[in-house]
């Protein structure tokens, strides 16, 4: 087999494994959608879909570009001690900043919840979102470490543990106990804690409590300029919920979000490809046949993506609204949200 073929095979294998990991992670969205739709009103479901975009934006702030800087300097580095030094600087920096940012969020809880949710009763559980941010901030780098050393199976095991706990607790807290939004956030806290514990071997293996200011400056010099672009991209991708709330109401946010989550099937494929692509691209960029390999991979990606778009656009509305013994995945109350599926795809 040629080196180009071997590289494509490696990329395809990693994409498949990362795809499984992201399918596990994103599958909870689809598996829990009928539960949320049947157990939560559009107003409450709308509140959930305003809180999660806020979490996504804040995750960027919690990382402030160190994730991009880490991959830039860690992956090409061959010396193990140097790699541990890079990991230590990144994790210690995030550890301190996470404590500071989380404390600031708790102090600003009242105005933030009022700005995001208005007078909605969900403001009473808004502080739970800050705990999720803290745990995700502490677990992000260990998970990224396994991506950076191209250990997709380890990555999938971490995501699988998180998803199983999250799914089980959602069924218990929301489905059986009827805790609604509080149950969703409580399940997320528990699953984020499990993710941190399962990923913690990467911390113990690499963290040595040494500090190198020069490495830290290099990481920030590379990573910080990426933050505005990432934030603006996320605002474009997630800001629609806030515009809908502003021009309409929170119930409309919930109805729209039901269709949006179906459209996120395409994001499963794109995210799986992107997760495998970054380490693969950096490790292959200095090879002679890199351009040919990249061209073939991207062509295949476009073909598969076009097929997924057509399949989901045509089949999602009739299948998801189909009546199964008086039940449907998307109930009539939320059916109007399916109009957005092709646009989201």
Name each model-derived stretch.
Residues 75-92, 255-345:
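Specific pore-lining/lateral-gate transmembrane helices of multi-pass inner-membrane transport
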Residues 103, 107, 118-141, 156-160, ...:
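Alpha-helical transmembrane segments of multi-pass membrane proteins
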Residues 29-44, 113-116, 234-265, 280-283, ...:
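Helix-terminus/linker motif at the lipid-water interface of multi-pass membrane proteins
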Residues 9-68, 98-106, 166-167, 224-250, ...:
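Signature of the first transmembrane helix
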Residues 123, 127, 156-204, 222:
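Hydrophobic alpha-helical transmembrane segments
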Residues 2, 70, 141-148, 152, ...:
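C-terminal transmembrane helix end/exit motif
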Residues 1-30, 82-88, 122, 153, ...:
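N-terminal membrane topogenesis motif
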Residues 1-7, 11, 181, 197-237, ...:
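Interhelical loop/hinge segments that connect adjacent transmembrane helices in multipass membrane
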């Amino acid at each position: 087999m040629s080196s180009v073929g071997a590289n494509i095979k490696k990329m395809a294998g990693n994409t498949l494994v990362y795809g499984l990991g992201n399918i596990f992670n994103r599958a909870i969205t689809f598996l829990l959608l009928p539960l949320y739709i049947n157990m939560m009103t559009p107003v409450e479901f709308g509140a959930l879909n305003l809180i999660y975009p806020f979490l996504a934006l804040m995750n960027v702030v919690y990382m402030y570009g160190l994730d991009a800087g880490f991959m830039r300097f860690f992956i090409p580095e061959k010396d193990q001690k140097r790699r541990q030094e890079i990991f230590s600087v990144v994790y210690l920096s995030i550890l301190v900043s996470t404590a500071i940012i989380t404390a600031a969020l708790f102090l600003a809880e009242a105005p933030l919840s009022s700005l995001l949710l208005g007078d909605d009763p969900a403001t009473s559980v808004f502080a739970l979102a800050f705990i999720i941010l803290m745990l995700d901030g502490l677990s992000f780098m260990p998970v990224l470490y396994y991506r950076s050393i191209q250990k997709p199976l380890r990555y999938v095991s971490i995501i699988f543990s998180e998803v199983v706990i999250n799914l089980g607790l959602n069924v218990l807290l929301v489905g059986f106990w009827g805790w609604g939004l509080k149950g969703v956030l409580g399940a997320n806290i528990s699953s984020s804690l499990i993710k941190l514990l399962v990923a913690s071997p990467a911390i113990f293996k690499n963290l040595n409590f040494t500090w190198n200011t020069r490495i830290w400056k290099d990481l920030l010099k590379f990573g910080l300029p990426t933050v505005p672009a990432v934030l603006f991209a996320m605002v474009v991708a997630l800001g629609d919920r806030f515009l809908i709330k502003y021009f309409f109401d929170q119930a409309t946010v919930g109805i729209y979000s039901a269709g949006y989550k179906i459209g996120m099937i395409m994001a499963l494929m794109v995210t799986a490809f992107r997760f495998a692509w970054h380490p693969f691209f950096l490790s292959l960029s200095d090879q002679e046949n890199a351009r040919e390999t990249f061209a073939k991979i991207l062509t295949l990606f476009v073909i598969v993506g076009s097929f997924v778009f057509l399949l989901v656009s045509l089949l999602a509305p009739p299948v998801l609204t189909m009546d199964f013994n008086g039940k449907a995945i998307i109930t009539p109350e939320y059916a109007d949200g399916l109009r957005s599926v092709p646009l989201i795809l």
